[in-house]
């Protein structure tokens, strides 16, 4: 019906799963930030409409939550690390998965390099949990990118999160 009405849509199988994201920053080595998932308040199936995903609707807002399940977090991060050699180097990106808690199934969705850096989305939210302000995140990305491409010679200061990703399970950011 939506296609017939002229709308651009992507149709996906409904899994009752969570969208899970591993944000990665560039550096001397890839910097994996906290594994994050989106959840909708009051929706056990975690279904998000297009309007909700884009912040275009009134009502409950989705939350960005650091994953609590250490076994699943480790598994998803291992999948991410396995893909890095194919794409490295890059400035920043996110690796997206679907995680079904009832079965433990993890499905790869996509890699999005140079993705949205809006202050209320995954890369910025995970950076915030690691102790970076949005300004510091943008500064890190710009300096690393220009240095990597030979535009400037940046003084490299190792990125040292104030909180390690495995320590933030369950912390939440309203988006």
List the model feature ranges, each with a label.
Residues 69-175:
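ATP-dependent carboxylate activation and anion-phosphoryl transfer catalytic cores
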Residues 1-78, 102-107:
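Phosphate-binding site of ATP-dependent enzymes
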């Amino acid at each position: 019906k939506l296609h017939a009405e002229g709308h651009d849509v992507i149709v996906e199988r409904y899994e009752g799963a969570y969208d899970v994201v591993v944000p990665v920053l560039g550096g001397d080595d890839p910097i994996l930030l906290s594994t994050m998932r989106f959840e909708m308040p009051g929706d056990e199936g975690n279904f998000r409409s297009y309007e909700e995903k884009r912040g275009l609707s009134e009502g409950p807002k989705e939350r960005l939550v650091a994953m609590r399940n250490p076994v699943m977090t480790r598994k998803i991060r291992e999948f991410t690390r396995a893909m890095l050699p194919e794409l490295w180097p890059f400035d920043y990106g996110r690796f997206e998965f679907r995680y079904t808690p009832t079965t433990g199934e993890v499905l790869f969705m996509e890699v999005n390099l140079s993705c949205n850096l809006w202050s209320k989305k995954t890369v910025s939210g995970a950076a915030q949990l690691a102790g970076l302000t949005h300004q510091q995140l943008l500064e890190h990305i710009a300096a690393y990118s220009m240095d990597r491409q030979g535009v400037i010679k940046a003084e490299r200061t190792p990125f040292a999160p104030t909180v390690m990703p495995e320590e933030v399970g369950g912390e939440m950011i309203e988006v």
